[in-house]
């Protein structure tokens, strides 16, 4: 691995030699599917945040990801390009055969077999409030899945629309505010217009979830 980004040298080079930019984690919020649970793996879409030189994550209280990070102090960010997997991991538990395991610091961490790449993070400086958990992240290990790695990725509005619709769907389920249904439909139309078959299947599943 290449050296750690200069923004994170405050943690000391002895902690990590992983350059997260190599894996597409840049300034802002990078949408990944995070896997946790050393014994019972779980996966859910989570944004990895880089802001003002700080690398951190925010997890909602009560989720499986929140509980596992609070208990174990580790998480794996999976770089995924399948929109259907984002929807499935938001509303359903993934099956055990969908996970693989990688070793870091003598521990075996669950990652997704479909990931193009993965990064194992140690969660430090954890702040647990009534609503959420915030933790700084130290990248411990990372790798590419050569079978899934794509050389060139062109931004696709349909894929991005699925991500936005999924976020609004979770907000609708929490609040019941119908304004989110209008936003979901807006992004569903965009996914249908600009996306491919995977995006359309993802939106179909999302609508099925909302109709339950």
Where are the regions a protein language model picked out?
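Basic, polyanion-binding surface patches
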Residues: 2-118, 122-212
């Amino acid at each position: 691995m290449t050296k750690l980004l200069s923004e994170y040298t405050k943690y000391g080079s002895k902690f990590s030699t992983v350059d997260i930019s190599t894996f597409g984690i840049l300034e802002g919020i990078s949408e990944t599917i995070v896997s946790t649970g050393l014994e019972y793996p779980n996966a859910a879409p989570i944004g990895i945040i880089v802001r003002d030189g700080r690398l951190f994550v925010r997890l909602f209280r009560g989720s499986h990801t929140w509980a596992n990070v609070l208990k174990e102090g580790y998480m794996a960010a999976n770089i995924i390009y399948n929109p259907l997997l984002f929807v499935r991991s938001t509303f359903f538990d993934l099956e055990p055969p969908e996970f693989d395991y990688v070793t870091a610091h003598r521990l075996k961490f669950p990652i997704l077999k479909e990931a193009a790449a993965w990064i194992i993070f140690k969660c430090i400086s954890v702040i647990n409030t009534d609503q959420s958990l915030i933790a700084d992240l130290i990248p411990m290990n990372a790798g590419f899945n050569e079978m899934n790695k794509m050389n060139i990725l062109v931004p696709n509005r349909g894929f991005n629309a699925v991500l936005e619709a999924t976020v609004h769907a979770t907000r609708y389920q929490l609040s019941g505010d119908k304004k989110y249904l209008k936003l979901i439909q807006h992004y569903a139309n965009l996914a249908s217009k600009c996306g491919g078959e995977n995006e359309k299947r993802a939106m179909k599943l999302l609508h099925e979830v909302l109709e339950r």
